[in-house]
Amino acid sequence: MDLKTGECRQLTQAHELDTASLSLLPDDRGFILFDGPALRQGNLSTLRDREVYSIPEGWTRGPGASMTGDGVSSLFFEVSPQASRLRLLGMAKGSATTVVEIPFPGSHPIARPRRAQVLYRQGDEALWLVNFDGRQNRKLKTASDGTIGTAFWAPNGRTVLYLHIPTDVTKLVAIREHTPDENSDKQVATTSQFASLGCNGDASVFVGASRNRNSPHILILLRVARRELMLCEHRCSDPFAVSPIFSPDSQRIYFQSDRDGKRAIYMVRVDKFVEETEA
């Protein structure tokens, strides 16, 4: 989509697109996605794509995929009835190696910025961290008495930011921060029942979509003040699909909603409230 004109163009003919696997390359010139069992790499200029890898027989694809920061490799899970394995795929030659094999379905691997480590999920139960060489595979000690919502690396790669959803429905959903190198976990702020979470370029401001049916809002939360500011209503039938994100310079927020009858992308300017960050 051209953000100035709103004009869209089709990038792929994928028949079994896994939207959770769609990821831009670090140079912004291409993208990867899973089309059924096939991992494909596309070029944004030529609109051509090629198959890089296919999931072998006896395995199925786990949810999610991502690129390493240097754009050399991609990360994804292959799942069998007995186990799952985290795969590191060299994009140039299409050769895959197994980072680690685990006895549960792994998903949504994310490379750690500036470090040879991978964050991945065990459903909504737990977050795990492992080195690229398969060593030090460990479960992170996140908050208890609840499940894990959105989780991602802070832009500097030092901490993991995530939503903690308490088992007790009378308690508020909270943004928490885990520091793997110190094995510490702390609450950043409670929220107006965020369904999903994003942050700006330096993680000083968060954006979320409320799951509260009576207050279906897009909000930003200032980290230092721990204060929320309402931006607009998303009125989406599925608040978990809203997925608000900041632009690279932190001056705009984009989100999706079906509030006008069909799924569309919306933009809100926040330059009056949020300082510009390096794009």
What are these regions (language model features)?
Residues 28, 70-71, 114-115, 157, ...:
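Conserved loop/turn motif of beta-propeller repeat scaffolds
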Residues 34, 77, 121, 163, ...:
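Residue-level marker for isolated small/hydroxyl-bearing positions within beta-strands
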Residues 2-18, 41-61, 89-107, 129-149, ...:
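Multi-bladed beta-propeller domains
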Residues 30-31, 74-75, 118, 159-161, ...:
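Hydrophobic beta-strand positions that form the internal "hydrophobic ladder"
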Residues 241-279:
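Blade-level signature of beta-propeller repeat domains, shared across WD40, Kelch, NHL, RCC1
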